[in-house]
Amino acid sequence: QPNSCRDLAGRKLLFSINKNNDLAWIREWAEFHAKIHGTDAVILVDNGSTRYEPAEILATLQAIPAIAHAAVPSWPYSFGPIDPAVRKDPYWARFLQIGSMSMILRRYGELCYGLLDTDIDELAGTHSGRSIYDLAHDSKGGLIVFRGTWIEATGPGARHRDFTHKLADPKAALSPQRKWALDPSRPWVRRLSVHPYWHWVQGRALFSKSMPEDALYWHFKGINTNWKAQRTAAPAGPVVEDARLAKTFAGLAP
């Protein structure tokens, strides 16, 4: 397979895996990160979508002026099962996730300015307004990790910006899964024993990780096909507006 790392040298890369997400969701996800963080390259692995062809996803991404490079590798293979017998890591058999993300790092991302890992239903932010890529680039070890907030499915909505409310209980609103951003220029990233996946980077160097208070992400229950859990159900308790998210959306063009 061809290696595109030189083509993406210096780029701020956003990546994820997709299956049957609305094209409007995909556009808003990419456009948000382009406007807020300076994303100018997107790699979206398509895992056998049946609603459209990979070329339609690519056209959606290429229609965003700020995205200088986009690719949609087609991986129509089994995502992998959950193994309940392995309590410590029941997701160990999800080989497509680990394999595809290692492919993104090695075939596209090694020379990028930064890599950002968020799913289609997740938007990254910072309290200060700084780019998440700059936080990773300026960090001591090159890898920043951050947690998020669940944004509730409070009604019908076509895009992320249609949802801005979270549960009033801070503990219930916490999305515990960790997301990350990486400066791939760090020497430890060159080791082939380093394997990124959704919530971690396996084989990372000791002390390479930091968790800056400035970084966060929003996890949208209303932007979901319910493939994993029934997330689009009504909120389980009282909700309040996430002021920072609402302010961020207010600064974007309609």
Model-based region annotation:
Residues 1-27:
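N-proximal low-complexity "stem/linker" segments adjacent to membrane-targeting elements
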Residues 12-13, 50-114:
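Active-site-proximal specificity loops/subdomain of glycosyltransferases
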Residues 19, 38-39, 47-50, 75-78, ...:
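An acidic- and aromatic-residue-enriched active-site/binding cleft used to recognize and process polar
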Residues 31-40:
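Short, acidic, metal-binding catalytic loop of nucleotide-sugar glycosyltransferases
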Residues 44, 104, 111-125:
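Short beta-strand-to-loop acidic/aromatic patch adjacent to the donor-nucleotide binding site
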